Amino acid sequence: MTQARTKKNPPLRVGVGGPVGSGKTTLLEMLCKAMRDRYDLVAITNDIYTKEDQRLLTISGALPAERIMGVETGGCPHTAIREDASINLEAVERMLAKFPDADVVFIESGGDNLAATFSPELSDLTIYVIDVAGGEKIPRKGGPGITKSDLLVINKTDLAPYVGASLEVMESDARKMRGGRPFVMGSVKSGQGLDEVIRFIEQQGMLGV
C-alpha cells in the first residue's frame, strides 16, 4: 500500500540539464551531499543507452542507492525531458510512491545540445550547466538552456587559463543573453559557486516555507 504524503507543500522538481561533460552529474552529486541532511531528496538520471550516471552517483555516496533511479531514454535525450516526458514523469511517480515525503526530486537530463529544455510538466525549476572548457563563445551562442533556464551555471572556471577563455567575456555575454535572469560562475567540483546554487533552489523553490 502506497504511503500518503504528510508534508503540506508538494515536492520541488529540479531539472538539471546541459551538454555532455559540462558537469551535470558532479553538480547533482555536490547538491545531494550538501542538502541531504536538511531535506528529503531523491534523484533521477537520464542516459541514452546505459545507467552510467546513476552508477556514478551511487558510487560517490551522494544518496542511498534506493533514492537514485536511472532512466534509459534511447534515441534523443531531449525528447525524454520535453516533447514526450512520460518516461520521466513515470519515474518521478514511482520515486514519490517510495518516498512520499521527498522535499526535492532532482532530474538530470542526458547530455544534449544548447536547445534542450525541460517540460514545465516535469520540472518546476531548471538549472542549465555549461563549462568553460567549451570555449568563451558558449554563452553568446544562446539557445533555450542558456537564455530561458531559471539558473545558468558556468562551470569549470578554474580551467579558463588552460583553454584561453576569458571569464570576463563569458560573464558579460551571459549577462546580455540572460536578460536579468540569474547565473553562477564557479567550479562545482571544488565547491566554488555551490552555495549560490543551493540558495537559489531554496529561495525560488520556497523550501522550508
From Swiss-Prot:
Subcellular location: Cytoplasm
Binding, GTP: G18, P19, V20, G21, S22, G23, K24, T25
A GO cellular component entry from the record: cytoplasm
A Pfam family per the record: cobW
InterPro entries in alphabetical order: CobW/HypB/UreG_nucleotide-bd, P-loop_NTPase, UreG
Gene3D superfamilies per UniProt: P-loop containing nucleotide triphosphate hydrolases (3.40.50.300)
Keywords: Chaperone, Cytoplasm, GTP-binding, Nickel insertion, Nucleotide-binding
Gene Ontology BP terms: urea catabolic process
Molecular function via GO: GTP binding; GTPase activity; nickel cation binding
Superkingdom of origin organism: Bacteria
Signal peptide coordinates: none
Major subcellular site: cytoplasm
Alphabetical list of PANTHER family matching this protein: UREASE ACCESSORY PROTEIN G (PTHR31715:SF0)
Its biological purpose: Facilitates the functional incorporation of the urease nickel metallocenter. This process requires GTP hydrolysis, probably effectuated by UreG.
Subunit structure of this chain's protein: Homodimer. UreD, UreF and UreG form a complex that acts as a GTP-hydrolysis-dependent molecular chaperone, activating the urease apoprotein by helping to assemble the nickel containing metallocenter of UreC. The UreE protein probably delivers the nickel.
The family this protein is said to belong to: Belongs to the SIMIBI class G3E GTPase family. UreG subfamily.
Protein's UniProt name: Urease accessory protein UreG
